[in-house]
């Protein structure tokens, strides 16, 4: 069936207007301190994340004399020590966004919520990482790893979505740029961690 003139007119009138994609103001981005903070936060978060992804199994399996947990790779305990923190990480990432939204709906300003969840997330992670370095109980280490992942998940409601607050029209580009900076940490952190382990044979320095 062919469209009638009235239908064609309706389609043209209701069609979304064409807007040219705005150019990215790179110079302004470099000078924009909030965006620089997002990029730094992404870099730091990825540094710890990819260090754990790369070396957590090795840490759990490493002999106690070398600062590891001494858990056999084929044991169920090893799977437990690796799996539980990962599950907690997934759940906390989802809940972190809901937490930030809930605080904003309660009347807290967006900027205070973003700063608050970032502060809790990063300072909390730093504290629990420090505690792991002196812990020799597997259960306590797993609990601390879970708490670290909870703190990292809380940050999902902070720098993880802050791009949309700074420039709604440039959200995709901002995420791409900060994500690219974060991937530099993803490349470097396993290399640095491996080098430090080879030189010092100490896990406490890694944490």
Label each PLM-derived region with a short phrase.
Residues 2-38, 70-75:
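Juxtamembrane intracellular "pre-TM" segments in multi-pass secondary transporters
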Residues 39, 79, 83, 119, ...:
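Conserved glycine-rich helix-kink/hinge and helix-boundary motifs of the Major Facilitator Superfamily
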Residues 43, 83, 87, 146, ...:
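Transmembrane alpha-helical cores of Major Facilitator Superfamily
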Residues 60-61, 99-100, 104, 192-201:
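Interfacial helix-cap and linker-helix signal at transmembrane-aqueous boundaries
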Residues 93, 167-200:
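A late C-terminal transmembrane helix in Major Facilitator Superfamily
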Residues 111-158:
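C-terminal transmembrane helical hairpin of 12-TM major facilitator-type secondary transporters
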